[in-house]
Amino acid sequence: MNDMPGLALPNASERYLQGIVGRHQWLRDGVMPSPLEFNDFIDHAADLLSDFDTVPAIWGKLSAVLRQRQQATGDTAWHRSLRDHKIAAMLHDEPTTAWSFRKPRGYSGDAHLIDFLYEHPAAAPDLNAASPLGRALNAMVVSSSASVAVQERRRLLASYLDMTAERVPNAEALVLACGHLRELEFTRSADRLVRLMALDQDPVSVAEMRRCYSGLASLCPVEASIGRMIVRPLVHGRFDLIYAAGLYDYLDDTTAERLTLGMLSALKPGGRLLFANFCRDVVDYGYMEAMMDWRLIPRDEPEMQRLVDRLPGADLANITMFRGLNRTVVYVLVEKRG
């Protein structure tokens, strides 16, 4: 019982956090730890994680420390030592982290991984099979800044599908690297589209999309790589909306430039092109690279502007660049001249 009115006692998570900061002076001072101090922190974090009630206290500090180490070293040697530490097995109890690290589909950021971040029912069996520690860690992963940005992106894409269907008679839309196309579940007007062509190179994703959304008559799932859009951008005709929201994070500048030009050429007059990229300063990157083996090619506004600058100005009616609500993803909306 608290015998001092007006004085709130710290909860368990706050007490753990106070203990972490108290033991590791450099955390409080905001300075770079030495390799010895970093290793001591990882040892301490692993010891605390044996009680999964400590997860909320540890998660934020762990993410920040891994990001700090990533930025300071500029190499991946520290990944190997961290993955050999007992903390790696504990963190891989978290199903999203384990899936990303194992890469069952052979590449990073696959559609089932995104289902984890969406907290979609398709990922529920994996989560239900996780340990208590894994489930506690999952609550942190899905509420991280990168995950929240992905969740917001899903709603944003649904809104652009709706706007296009409501704005343009007989509208046609093209989605590149569509994954499972889960944004369809948030739309209200997708059934008004005459054609919704959804391309993905992963046959498992295309099959899942067909299975889940077979009732949408306008949906045209296609198993294809983005190379088709680069080499033959008009092979599927022209569209009122084209978007590639989760693709640019994996493209080098040359490929991104060529793809952007190809998508613009496949727009109808007055059509809209939306593409997006994770920004550079995201605290989750250290954890993603070290524990999930998931690497992105981040871009801020200047890099995105350079992609836009490669487009023929005569074709452009308007360009809007904006960030998502938590400032983690930058979007570019290009409107083609009518």
Task: List each language-model region with its residue ranges.
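N-terminal accessory segments
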Residues: M1-D126, G134-A139, S143-S145, Y160, ...
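Conserved SAM-binding loop of SAM-dependent methyltransferases across substrates and taxa
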Residues: G179-L193
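A short, conserved alpha-helix within the catalytic core of class I
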Residues: Y250-M263
